Amino acid sequence: MKVRVVAVGRDRSGLYAPAVEEYAKRLGRYLRFELVEVPEARKLAGTAGAKGEEGATLLAKIGPRERVVVLDERGDELTSVAFAERVRRWMERGQDVALLIGGSDGLAPEVLARADERLAVSRFTLAHRLARLVLVEQLYRAMTILRGEPYHK
């Protein structure tokens, strides 16, 4: 199984990228993992236009048979153990998974319509680059839970 995090924008601040890269490297021991960053839309067209442009770019990165899971504030809130079980089910299906993270204005309706699942990483509103770090860390945590390794206590 391959898991891809497809996210709008780059971490220009440098705050989160090193940690995301570290967890991505660790994930490589368990599964094929890829982080795909797509550019943020210019806000000249307004919020709706920018969301639409980013949405089209995200959808273009998805394979026809990939399971699409979006991060959305109205998505399922899971514990780490429940998320690990979700990952286990994805692995049992043998289907590649694309986890999509929108930009600062959220996801376009077309992206939400394409989603097979919606997940929320927190009830808090998080910067989308911080949400990316939380998601990648939780993927790593899920793999250690499934393997019975001591990372998750």
Curated annotation (Swiss-Prot):
Protein's name according to its UniProt entry: Ribosomal RNA large subunit methyltransferase H
GO cellular component, one term: cytoplasm
CDD domains: RlmH-like
GO molecular function terms listed in the Swiss-Prot or TrEMBL record: rRNA (pseudouridine-N3-)-methyltransferase activity
Keywords, sorted A to Z: Cytoplasm, Methyltransferase, rRNA processing, S-adenosyl-L-methionine, Transferase
Role, per record: Specifically methylates the pseudouridine at position 1915 (m3Psi1915) in 23S rRNA.
Binding positions (S-adenosyl-L-methionine): 71, 102
Family: Belongs to the RNA methyltransferase RlmH family.
Pfam families, per the entry: SPOUT_MTase
EC class of the enzyme, as a word: transferase
Catalytic reactions of this protein: pseudouridine(1915) in 23S rRNA + S-adenosyl-L-methionine = N(3)-methylpseudouridine(1915) in 23S rRNA + S-adenosyl-L-homocysteine + H(+)
